[in-house]
Amino acid sequence: MKITGIYKILNIITNKSYIGQSLDVKDRIRRHKYNLNRGKHSNPHLQKSYIKYGTDNFKYEILYQFDVNGLSKDDICNHLNIKEIEMIILFDSFNNGYNLTTGGDRHYIVSDATKIKLSESHKG
């Protein structure tokens, strides 16, 4: 079963994090591990740290997941963008971590209508 959401890669020695988003978090984490182990990760700061501290000093965690049933792909991506930005701020992973951007890079603009839908979907 696919999990859509936000994940964190944490260096347990330095407490630095990388925050990411995915429509399939488990597969995305698997691909991060594969590329890091091969020394071919697209994020040079994360790769360098991984080589220095070793695989045993990195923890992978799903921070946030949500039910995508009934949502359009645009709504899903907008929601992921918003949550990714929130988590990057929360864990300070742009200024003091491995994120190379401030997040929300799925190239979708969060419309007011989408913001209302997302807000309503999270009310009890």
Q: Model regions: which residues?
A:
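Structure-specific nucleic-acid interaction/processing domains
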Residues: 1-117
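Short, intrinsically disordered, charge-balanced linker/junction segments flanking boundaries
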Residues: 119-124
